[in-house]
A protein has these predicted regions:
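Non-catalytic DNA-recognition/assembly elements of restriction-modification systems
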Residues: 1-37, 124-133, 140, 146-189, ...
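Sequence-specific dsDNA recognition surfaces
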Residues: 2-53, 75-76, 180-193, 207-238
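Short coil/turn segments at secondary-structure boundaries
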Residues: 18-24, 109-112, 172-175, 192-199, ...
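A short glycine-rich beta-alpha junction/loop motif
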Residues: 73-80, 105-126, 245, 260-268, ...
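Interdomain signal-transducing alpha-helices
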Residues: 94, 122, 128-131, 281
């Protein structure tokens, strides 16, 4: 194994930074920073253009890696430009290898010190290239599958509009009612800091709430004593709706069967009355119509929030219950197709 600094070096000093105020939507050269998007802006500037490509970009705060193969400028602070020291390693191989390293999340701090502790295997260049080809083939297959899954999601949205109409215009004249009156319970998770442990009962936060599913590969835990204490506030049950209400606001999913967990404050819980079915509620909340309400009511700060008082002011609509059941059948059928694609293809 070879240490990181024997394989790569930090060449950030030779890359010119462009202020965010100088980003353009179009231009000759891309501006790369540590954010989630590959390219965050463009410029027609030439002075300071970094041309010694390829390079690997590392986000010192975000822990993101990017492989850049065309001349570029860098954006905000925290964008590291990493170069290989020799031709013994292939850039794409190193990039894929780095993507699969576990770099600790220490919040909005610098993380490059952890990257410098990474060790690389000593593998013949030809074998590296062979591995890269297989990984790229796999990535293409994954991209094709993901595109199909996205098209199935679009199909669900289309059926939602067909059954319930254009709610912006309320073409079917459904009753429009605040969530405060549609729900029998609206609350959120524990406000004080729970005592966490290494294993036990799930403690969910906003990062664990995705649209239509839970993300449990990066989750905290509490023990039975802490669970009992927090449960005095609320005990989540199957069919409740979970809504992320801090940071990335507005993601939601239905609580599935047979899962025991508690919540922190960044997750809201909505328990609708019997005239609103959970699956319908989930797709109503993720609709563009409802998300616009959320965006208009969430607090504008460095970290957006949408707490109980504002959640109660959000408005839903109440379609015929039999139409809701018909929609549930559609969702279940499409989810079966998704399952087949994920498992067997």
């Amino acid at each position: 194994m070879k240490m990181f600094l024997d394989v790569m070096y930090d060449d950030t000093k030779n890359a010119r930074k462009v202020k965010s105020s100088d980003y353009n939507n179009e231009g000759k050269y891309p501006i790369i920073d540590q954010g989630s998007k590959l390219i965050y802006g463009y410029t027609d500037e030439l002075d300071g253009l970094y041309t010694d490509v390829p390079v690997i970009i590392f986000g010192d705060h975000t822990r993101r890696f990017k492989l850049i193969e065309e001349p570029f400028f860098i954006g905000a602070d925290g964008t590291k430009v990493l170069k290989l020291r020799s031709l013994a390693y292939d850039y794409k191989f190193i990039y894929y290898y780095l993507l699969h390293q576990n770099i600790p999340d220490t919040g909005y701090n610098r993380h490059f010190k952890w990257v410098k502790e990474i060790e690389f295997p000593e593998i013949a260049h030809s074998i590296q290239c062979s591995i890269v080809k297989k990984l790229e083939l796999l990535n293409n297959l994954i991209s094709t599958k993901n595109e199909l899954l996205r098209s199935l999601d679009v199909l669900i949205k289309s059926r939602f509009v067909e059954l319930f109409g254009d709610i912006d215009c309320n073409t079917k004249n459904w009753p429009i009612i605040t969530l405060e009156n549609l729900a029998e319970l609206i609350t959120d998770g524990e406000h004080s800091t729970p005592k966490r442990c290494n294993e036990g009962i799930y403690l969910l936060s906003a990062r664990n709430i995705l649209n239509h599913s839970l993300k449990l590969d990066d989750v905290d835990y509490i023990d039975e004593t802490e669970y009992s204490r927090i449960s005095k506030r609320v005990i989540p049950k199957a069919g409740d709706i979970l809504l992320s209400c801090s940071g990335s606001v507005g993601r939601c999913c239905v609580v599935p069967l047979e899962i025991k967990f508690q919540l922190v404050r960044s997750v809201a819980l909505i328990r609708f009355k019997s005239d609103i079915t959970p699956i319908f509620a989930e797709y109503m909340i993720t609709s563009d119509w409802f998300q616009r309400q959320i965006n208009s009511l969430k607090t504008a700060s460095s970290q957006a929030n949408l707490f109980q008082g504002r959640i109660k002011k959000l408005k839903g609509f109440v379609p015929d219950i039999y139409l809701q059941y018909e929609f549930i059948k559609v969702v279940n059928q499409i989810n079966k197709l998704k399952f087949v694609q994920i498992v067997y293809n």
